[in-house]
Regions:
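A short, well-structured beta->alpha microelement
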Residues: 26-39
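N-terminal beta-loop-helix "entrance" segment that forms/cooperates
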Residues: 15, 19, 37-52
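Structured loop/turn residues at beta-strand edges in well-structured enzyme cores
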Residues: 1, 41, 103
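The conserved SAM/SAH-binding core of class I Rossmann-like methyltransferase domains
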Residues: 6, 33, 76
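FMN-binding flavodoxin-like domain, especially the glycine-rich phosphate-binding loop
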Residues: 24-29, 45-48, 53-163
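Short, conserved, surface-exposed binding loops centered on an aromatic residue
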Residues: 36-40, 64-67
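N-terminal beta1-alpha1 ligand-phosphate binding loop
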Residues: 2-24
């Protein structure tokens, strides 16, 4: 059974997950590895990776998912904010909405991913203003926590998710 690993990665986090999948799956069965592309549609099973934008997969990934029909799909992604299972499930549910009903989701995985330093700088600039949102300290703390992700534990959990 052929497979493709299709991913969109703005900061390299999702690319790291895609590379981990590529290392774990049989190389001879892989017909495509890379950014969303029609060439991947030849595969029976698609591992589709994304970065989170406004609570769902990025636009390129959502457009690609809409092209899938009768495929087995494993979704994987990263999100800079949060590390809670309910938050990740909400993102995955919003992403699954792009899939046609003829597809079968065979699994999914999400983890936190590091964000560009410009995000922290924006939070710090906001905090310097007299009237700022009250949760900026929590946002900065989350940014700092995300710096090590995806980490070795995340990659191991991904490996387990595809077994």
């Amino acid at each position: 059974m052929s497979y493709a690993i299709v991913f969109s990665s703005k900061t390299g986090n999702t690319a790291l997950l895609a590379q981990t999948l590529q290392e774990q799956l049989p190389q001879t069965d892989c017909c495509y590895f890379g950014a969303p592309n029609a060439a991947a549609l030849a595969a029976d099973t698609l591992y589709v990776g994304f970065w989170t934008d406004k609570g769902k997969a990025d636009a390129d990934t959502l457009e690609f998912l809409k092209q899938l029909h009768g495929k087995r799909v494993f979704l994987f992604g990263t999100a800079g904010f949060g590390g809670s299972a309910p938050y990740f499930e909400k993102i995955l549910a919003a992403t699954r909405e792009a899939l046609d009903g003829s597809n079968t989701v065979i699994g999914s995985f999400m983890c936190q991913g590091k964000m560009p330093v410009s995000v922290r700088q924006r939070y710090e600039a906001m905090k310097a203003k007299p009237l700022h949102i009250p949760n900026l300290d929590a946002l900065i703390e989350n940014f700092d926590k995300a710096l090590s992700h995806p980490d070795a534990a995340d990659l191991e959990q991904l490996k387990q998710a595809i077994k």
